[in-house]
Amino acid sequence: MKLYEYEGKEIARKYGIETPRGILATSVEDVDKAYRELNTGTVVLKSQVLVGGRGLAGGVKKASNLEEALTKARELFSMSIKGERVEKILVEEAVCISRELYMSLTVDRATRKLVYLASGMGGVEIEELARKHPDKILRIPVDPFIGYSGYMARHALGFLGLQWDKLGQLDNIMRAMYKIMIDYDAELVEFNPLAYTCDGRLTALDAKIIIDDNSLYRHPDLQPLYGRDATPYEKVAKQLDFNYVELDGDIGVISNGAGLTMATMDSILHYGGRPANFLDIGGGATRERVREAVKIVVTHPRVKAVLVNIFGGITRCDEVASGIVEALSETKVAKPIVVRMLGTNEEEGRRILIEHGITVYTEMDEAVLRIIQLVRGVG
């Protein structure tokens, strides 16, 4: 679960990490009040969205006077960034920046440890930095039996090229990041940029914290926030009790069982396609459940074609086939659909699909290759 920047900064301040003075605004009138209260001349207006890339999308603006702040606030409140409307703006004092650094603590799934990532090139996406300048990133693994230790700050200090008198500040920040990570069951604590200000302070100009959804039972204060970062399709799927996650591809995926669904996605990637989602209908899915699953996937604007991969154990293939046909009849969406079907009542399921002009395969690889051809407009 992602937290907004202002929420991440509230947590950071609670643990002693310095952030710029700021006030949250939900209207232009609030921006007016915030500007007057900050009484600082130049301010930064930062749209509060849970998607990335807001800076490139124009979601962060500077203003040097009240009139300019109100004009730019109106612009921000009228924006949508990657489909998410801007409903909150963090109005912050502008900070004189000497250098922009990067600092995060995250989970290294390969080593099954927490790892600090530090770089002297802050303000850019860490994925882009890792791709273009991997030598500019310092990795400091954390022994789970020891936790944070002061040598980590000394190591980072030298790599970042900071003066020795900044060790205390950096140590406090890294120690606090570790405490936040543990106390909140976080998957990521990131300050990008972590600014080295003109007067020699280390200040978190941005804060990104992601909480492990599975830990929310331990955090009742965070439970009301769960699901707010879901897309409209994910919200519908949640209401219907589907395991559904949106991805960036264009091939819709529906299968039964998490293992088979992931294997289907892996196969699509292996042959050069890009899955648009993960949707597991579960075992013993009824015609009605299949119908609703297909409707979610086939109506998504990014999906160009749909692959349904079913192994019929307690799931009956004829029920699946009937659900597919009903969904296509109700939605009237003309997108290619390919089905791989094997197992209980397979023959009846194949008959139903073939009668309605839907291609059916027995082998998964054949079905995957066919759906990729259809997406590419081949055959």
UniProtKB/Swiss-Prot annotation:
Cofactor, how bound (note): Binds 1 Mg(2+) ion per subunit.
Record pathway: Carbohydrate metabolism; tricarboxylic acid cycle; succinate from succinyl-CoA (ligase route): step 1/1
Residues the record lists as binding ATP: 46, 53-55, 92, 95, 100
Residues binding substrate: 256, 313-315
Catalytic activity, reaction form: succinate + ATP + CoA = succinyl-CoA + ADP + phosphate; GTP + succinate + CoA = succinyl-CoA + GDP + phosphate
Intrachain S-S bonds: none
Ranges for domain ATP-grasp: 9-236
Domain of life (superkingdom): Archaea
Enzyme Commission number(s): 6.2.1.5
GO-annotated cellular components: succinate-CoA ligase complex
Transmembrane domains' residue ranges: none
EC primary class: ligase
Keywords: ATP-binding, Ligase, Magnesium, Metal-binding, Nucleotide-binding, Tricarboxylic acid cycle
Cofactor: Mg(2+)
Binding sites annotated in the UniProt record for Mg(2+): 192, 206
Alphabetical GO biological process terms: succinyl-CoA metabolic process; tricarboxylic acid cycle
GO MF entries: ATP binding; magnesium ion binding; succinate-CoA ligase (ADP-forming) activity; succinate-CoA ligase (GDP-forming) activity
NCBIfam families: PRK00696.1, sucCoAbeta
HAMAP family associated with the record: Succ_CoA_beta
Subunit architecture: Heterotetramer of two alpha and two beta subunits.
Function: Succinyl-CoA synthetase functions in the citric acid cycle (TCA), coupling the hydrolysis of succinyl-CoA to the synthesis of either ATP or GTP and thus represents the only step of substrate-level phosphorylation in the TCA. The beta subunit provides nucleotide specificity of the enzyme and binds the substrate succinate, while the binding sites for coenzyme A and phosphate are found in the alpha subunit.
Family: Belongs to the succinate/malate CoA ligase beta subunit family.
Protein name: Succinate--CoA ligase [ADP-forming] subunit beta
Gene: sucC
